[in-house]
Amino acid sequence: MSVALALNLACSGAEPEKAIFVVPDTTVVDPPEELPASPSTTLEFDSGEITDVSAQANDVPPEASSEATTTTEPKRLWTLLAGGDVLLDRTEPKGIDPFKGVQPHLSSADIAIVNLEMAITERGEPYDKEFVFRAPGSAALTLAGAGIDVVSLANNHTLDFGLIGLEDTIGVLDEVEILRPGAGGNNAEAYAPRVMSLDNGIRVAFVSATAVVPGGFAASSTRAGVADARGAISRVLAAVRAAASGNDVVVVSVHWGVERRTCPNESQRDLARELIDAGANLILGHHPHVLQPIETFDRTVIAYSLGNFVWHPRYGITGETGALEVFFDGARVEGYLFHPHVLDDDGGPRPVREGDRYNRIIDITEGRCEEHDPGLDVTEDKSDPASSPETG
């Protein structure tokens, strides 16, 4: 069973509740059909306390119904599904579909987004570092066929095969109509919000940036590259503010944190608050390659790290992951579900519903991360593959 977490309104001070959907501030409503009813759970919010939500939903007075005389706006419900790091360097050459275990979630979402942790190219020279990742051009078709609509390119592997590799990556993603925020032919393109318009009229803007920036990766006015959240944070925040001013929802993807650490650090938390102040409605983190907690602040959902969504086994990384499903009513974040998965032998996500790995996933995403944090020293000797934290 998936774990449902309520949106924690900052003004209420309440802890996130399990198995309940967030109720809007002024009206009691039925939760969407996808969410399990939870009549025994209590949710506190601004205007008081609601108990037995599913029962009270049928007691809404007639004047609040959707008759022609009502002034209540019709609901515009939609969902976004987010996964973590995606690497297709081994599955694509073998013709393996790593997304089949999560296909139901991808298919049901209005928007699906992941972090693309590789170049899509067969050209270019490898960057001088320990790990460089790429997949052939057919990988773009695999992503599109799986139902992925948006990929973040702001990470420390997009330029693993140089500027020509980035050019190929952008080209094939554009061909299959996948939005690709976070990189471009210059800094104006790299930082620019990419916008998707839904059938219900909602405009969703995506901004991506990375705080992990190898030398030569950052975009400039004259050079292609990625959006830099380490050396040009003011530009990232300006992009978020611009996105918020002209769109309904702003989703920010950030490559940050320390690899294999299950707890976010202060730099992540500080940047998250700055992004929220700038107008972010949803913050999706990646780079640690393991799960980190999911929190809420001012109706913004913060997933500090969504782990590896598709990734071959490497250096003791647990393979515990999941899909974050965020529910919106128009421009308003209403709640979220996290669907626990583990990676199979091919590196693809498969649902997990019980056992130690399931319990570990729940602990970490609900904030009990310290007991599962390996406490690794990132300066460890990388000559020992079993202990190397440098995986991507």
How would you label these PLM feature ranges?
Residues V29-P32, T42-D52, A57-E63, E67-G392:
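Acidic, metal/ion-coordinating pockets
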Residues S12-E15:
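Bacterial signal peptide processing site
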Residues M1-A4:
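Sec-dependent N-terminal signal peptides
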Residues N8-A10:
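C-terminal motif of bacterial Sec signal peptides marking the signal peptidase cleavage site
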